[in-house]
Amino acid sequence: MKKCRCGRSGCVCILVMKREYGMEKNLKREKEHTTEYVLQKAVCFRAGEFSKEEKYIVPEEKYDLYLNGEMIHTFFCSPWYLEDLAYGFLYLEGYILKSEQIKEICVKQQEHRIEVVADKECDMRRQDAKETGKKAEEKKISSKEIMSLAAALDERSHRFRLTGGVHSAALAKDGEILLMREDVGRHNAVEKLLGACVREQIDTADKTIVFSGRVAAEILEKAAAIGAPTLIAVSAPTSRAVELAEEKGILLVGFARGESFNVYTFPERLAEVI
């Protein structure tokens, strides 16, 4: 196995310099070091008969997150876009306020560690970003755009179609998906997406989050922490998520499938007159 710049085998080292890498180059670099799928032998029952087959399943691994030498969290996650997962977690939990505070990230795959070197002031947690999320700006959206984005998320979810085992979270604007993150865990998928936004300093005030899973309160809080005004979900929200969406000023859409969807908050923001 090739050694990374730190000289250690099995380590993916990312030196975070101000805007050194564009988004697509960062994605390509991490993908080269990750496992997309696992081929698993299985006994399958179909139409009254058994057969031995090989099935694709999604990888799930345990990674410990270290901040300036101290372990602060353990992830059970899919082993791709791990630097975005670290950014998202550190931002949401109040360790960092901006991407420049992180100086270096080393993803050590053999040791299952994500090591972050950050400013010393990041050693102490500040106020939880999920509790202080900005009030979302109002933004109109059409029913056509809602249905188009839900369909686009499904079309781009190739890992789900192959394995049935991942959640997807995407950032969109004007009916177009700008970036997407996937993970075996729905919370991880959202944290990876928001981490990418923090890392690339993306202004999300006029963007839409599109999500494949159920929207519970914590998912809503994580979306609100960045300030996206609209959250479109393929599945259902919970009662607490609807309450939080009202408080945070988020247009919450659920069951966005085919040519139907439900709007739970701020229906007046639909472009059509109701």
Where are these regions (language model features)?
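Polybasic, lysine-rich low-complexity intrinsically disordered segments
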Residues: K2-K3, K18
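Intrinsically disordered, low-complexity regions enriched in acidic/Ser/Thr/Pro/Gln residues
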Residues: C4-C6, C13, E24-D174, L179-M180
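Short amphipathic alpha-helical "recognition" segments used for binding
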Residues: G7, Y21-G22, E131-K134, R186, ...
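Feature captures the catalytic cores and cofactor-binding loops of soluble hydro-lyases/lyases
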Residues: R186-I274
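Histidine/lysine/aspartate-rich catalytic loop segments that bind and position anionic ligands
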Residues: H158-I202, T208-I209
